[in-house]
């Protein structure tokens, strides 16, 4: 703060000097070369979990939503896609726990959500889908009270304790599925009334099996699914934002989503 004892003219001059000094400081900051460095290397390097269906499936013929979007992005940027598996991604929603470094990749995918924790650590792309707990059943269910359920947690970073509390509040008897096959079998055989799992996976299972999928009630939170980038990589972020917009406008994004979610389109949010 400028002291009040300084004459008015001097205060005005000093104010201008401070403003010009700040502007000069901005111009002297190192230029963001993230996009030019990526173009120089010819690679868009992405860290993803080995498997996180339907974002990452491990199936070469249908590799997952995020893998297909990353391939399309790399093509838009005239780059080759290089994938580095990281088993920690998606096990929780805190990227600080994933031990990923800038030396490994420019983009993080396959379980990144635009939470305050993520945004304190990473830049994020626009959202192209939502995640949260979803419910799967052979037929739509209006009232969960007193029903039987099976829960498939997988490696999802969703809050399992919150789901457990919610189910108990509805007097739902539930078991934990060891894998997706047992989850589906319990629904097919009528051993349970509904299943609870991550919503993107719920959509995929419902589309494949002819079941119904719906969001869990709103007391269980939902999160925007995004790509993560390193703080300060603004030129690369702008290129990725533009690339995603092109993929959406062309209809390619909707086609990718439909292949894995039975026609339910994802929504992009800033």
Spans of features found by a protein language model:
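Extended ligand-binding regions for polar small-molecule ligands
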Residues: 12-29, 64-76, 139-158, 165, ...
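Ligand-binding cleft/hinge of the Venus flytrap
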Residues: 56-57, 71-85, 125, 153-178, ...
């Amino acid at each position: 703060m400028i002291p009040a004892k300084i004459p008015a003219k001097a205060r005005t001059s000093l104010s201008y000097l401070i403003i010009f000094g700040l502007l000069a400081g901005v111009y002297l900051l190192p230029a963001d070369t993230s996009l030019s460095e990526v173009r120089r290397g010819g690679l868009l390097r992405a860290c993803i979990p080995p498997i996180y269906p339907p974002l990452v499936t491990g199936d070469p013929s249908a590799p997952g939503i995020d893998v297909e979007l990353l391939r399309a992005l790399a093509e838009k940027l005239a780059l080759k896609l290089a994938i580095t598996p990281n088993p920690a991604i998606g096990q929780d929603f805190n990227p600080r726990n994933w031990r990923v470094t800038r030396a490994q990749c420019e983009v993080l995918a396959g379980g990144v959500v635009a939470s305050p924790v993520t945004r304190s650590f990473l830049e994020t792309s626009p959202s192209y889908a939502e995640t949260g707990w979803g419910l799967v059943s052979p037929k739509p269910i209006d009232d969960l009270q007193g029903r039987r359920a099976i829960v498939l947690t997988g490696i999802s970073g969703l809050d399992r304790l919150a789901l457990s509390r919610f189910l108990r509040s509805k007097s739902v008897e539930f078991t934990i599925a060891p894998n997706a096959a047992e989850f589906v079998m319990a629904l097919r055989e009528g051993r349970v009334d509904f299943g609870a799992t991550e919503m993107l996976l719920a959509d995929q299972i419902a589309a494949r099996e002819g079941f119904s999928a719906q969001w869990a009630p709103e007391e269980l939170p939902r999160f925007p699914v995004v790509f993560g980038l390193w703080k300060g990589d603004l030129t690369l972020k702008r290129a990725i934002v533009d690339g995603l917009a092109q993929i959406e406008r062309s209809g390619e994004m909707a086609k990718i989503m439909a292949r894995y979610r039975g026609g339910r389109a994802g929504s992009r949010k800033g």
